[in-house]
Amino acid sequence: MSEAAKTLDGWYCLHDLRSIDWVSWKTLSSEEREQAIVEFLNIIEKWNKVAAEKQGSHAMYTIVGQKADIMFMLLRPTMEELNEIETELNKTTLAEYMIPAYSYVSVVELSNYLPADEDPYQNPQILARLYPELPTANHICFYPMDKRRQGNDNWYMLPMEERKKLMYSHGKIGRQYAGKVRQVITGSVGFDDYEWGVTLFADDVLQFKKLVYEMRFDEVSARYGEFGTFFVGNILPSEKVTSFLHV
């Protein structure tokens, strides 16, 4: 049996994507819509306080295309806290005019390829990646993925050393985009339908296409990668929520 890679796990993660029922939303009076928006912004302010205390992080983006209208990416120390956030949001007036489009549950994950004599949880750089402050980049790209396990293309039957070698080569491509694209990898084996979630942040949306396309030619992706639905969007700052929901 091949050796399983050890992982380092950080904050739990929820990608919550929703569509807005604009037709029903328009039936509310201006006052009712304003009250609903204020209620929603109060929840966002709670999230901001948690982030300021470094007990979690969040990102909010509008999604381009028909798959969804808005995405919340939420990071918290426990799965219970993610559930509480989701439930509180579902109880708002605004949620009555939102339709669940997609969700993904995972945990921030790093593969442990550090020297055996080093405690990764004492490494500030590792801690910053396990418990990240999500960036306020202009754009987001999220997609789930698996490692293929079919016939001769079975990732999980490869020896550990070969997997390390392949992942090192794969990572070299990603490092070429340092400063252009920030990546958050979350593990979801046993949590959701795929094995990993990949979230990319960039100020230049074209960098997503360049990075993903270049990685398609790397053996890890070309031979072993299987991908789910891609979601791409634009940042939605709190101060623009009112204009976004204005009808």
From Swiss-Prot:
The active site is at 143. One of its GO terms (molecular function) is heme binding. Keywords: Heme, Heme biosynthesis, Iron, Metal-binding, Oxidoreductase. It comes from Bacillus cytotoxicus (strain DSM 22905 / CIP 110041 / 391-98 / NVH 391-98). PANTHER family: COPROHEME DECARBOXYLASE (PTHR36843:SF1), HEME-DEPENDENT PEROXIDASE YWFI-RELATED (PTHR36843). This is Coproheme decarboxylase. Its EC number is 1.3.98.5. It catalyses: Fe-coproporphyrin III + 2 H2O2 + 2 H(+) = heme b + 2 CO2 + 4 H2O; Fe-coproporphyrin III + H2O2 + H(+) = harderoheme III + CO2 + 2 H2O; harderoheme III + H2O2 + H(+) = heme b + CO2 + 2 H2O. Its cofactor is Fe-coproporphyrin III. One of its GO terms (biological process) is heme B biosynthetic process. Fe-coproporphyrin III acts both as a substrate and a redox cofactor. Involved in coproporphyrin-dependent heme b biosynthesis. Catalyzes the decarboxylation of Fe-coproporphyrin III (coproheme) to heme b (protoheme IX), the last step of the pathway. The reaction occurs in a stepwise manner with a three-propionate intermediate. Pathway: Porphyrin-containing compound metabolism; protoheme biosynthesis. It comes from the Bacteria. Belongs to the ChdC family. Type 1 subfamily. Gene3D superfamilies: Apc35880, domain 1. Fe-coproporphyrin III binds at residues 129, 143-147, 170, 183, 221.
